[in-house]
Amino acid sequence: MKRIVIIDYGLGNLRSVQKGLEHVGANPAISGNPEEILTADGIILPGVGAFIDAMKCLIPLKGVIAEFAESGKPMLGICLGQQVLMSSSEEGRLTGGLDLIQGRVLRFPKSELKVPHMGWNNIRIKQDHPLFKGISDGSFVYFVHSYYVDTTAENTLASCEYGLDFSASVVNSKGNVMGTQFHPEKSGTTGLKILKNFVEMC
């Protein structure tokens, strides 16, 4: 069985992601150990909370995560985990991210729409990629976020509309570093299928 490690860096919904992966037949480990991360077949970077707090907690693992990404093995960031994959965020003050995917994290502008963007919304699939194998365009998934990713079309796997069009799922140029702004572990059968697809990529 493939070894999937959920990175424990002090922030994130580790147990719900673990349960989602177990539901699709994986046996994930939760670890912040660099050796366990580097020897994994795939890693997941979950996250809830503030971007700047996440980056402070990730300082000891920044090089390890970059090395894993360079190896070509699959990596998935979820929610805040997607945001920290990017170059920078304007949350709090301008804060540098892991810079594994070019792009910025911006706050939703003031409008009649409530922020955070919370609840079910549909996504538009923009690229043919194994992460979205068998997922229908227009599928509904579950979001909870006040900031969104702004990146290129080349780095966008799926988009979502909430006052503006934003990247609901991102990918690097090699195709192995991916992110979802939505929570696949809370997105019913669609989300579980996405997690299953990730496991199959590992």
Swiss-Prot record:
Quaternary structure (record): Heterodimer of HisH and HisF.
Organism: Methanosarcina acetivorans (strain ATCC 35395 / DSM 2834 / JCM 12185 / C2A)
SUPFAM superfamilies: Class I glutamine amidotransferase-like
Major site of localization recorded for this protein: cytoplasm
Keyword hit for Lyase: yes
Subcellular locations according to the entry: Cytoplasm
GO CC annotations, alphabetized: cytoplasm
PROSITE patterns associated with the record: GATASE_TYPE_1
Molecular function (Gene Ontology), one example: glutaminase activity
SMART domains: GATase_5 (SM01211)
Gene3D superfamilies: 3.40.50.880
Protein name: Imidazole glycerol phosphate synthase subunit HisH
Encoding gene per record: hisH
Annotated ranges, domain Glutamine amidotransferase type-1: 3-202
Catalytic activity: 5-[(5-phospho-1-deoxy-D-ribulos-1-ylimino)methylamino]-1-(5-phospho-beta-D-ribosyl)imidazole-4-carboxamide + L-glutamine = D-erythro-1-(imidazol-4-yl)glycerol 3-phosphate + 5-amino-1-(5-phospho-beta-D-ribosyl)imidazole-4-carboxamide + L-glutamate + H(+); L-glutamine + H2O = L-glutamate + NH4(+)
NCBIfam families per record: IMP_synth_hisH
Domain of life from the UniProt record: Archaea
Keywords noted in UniProt: Amino-acid biosynthesis, Cytoplasm, Glutamine amidotransferase, Histidine biosynthesis, Hydrolase, Lyase
Function: IGPS catalyzes the conversion of PRFAR and glutamine to IGP, AICAR and glutamate. The HisH subunit catalyzes the hydrolysis of glutamine to glutamate and ammonia as part of the synthesis of IGP and AICAR. The resulting ammonia molecule is channeled to the active site of HisF.
Listed Pfam families: GATase
CDD domains per the UniProt record, alphabetical: GATase1_IGP_Synthase (cd01748)
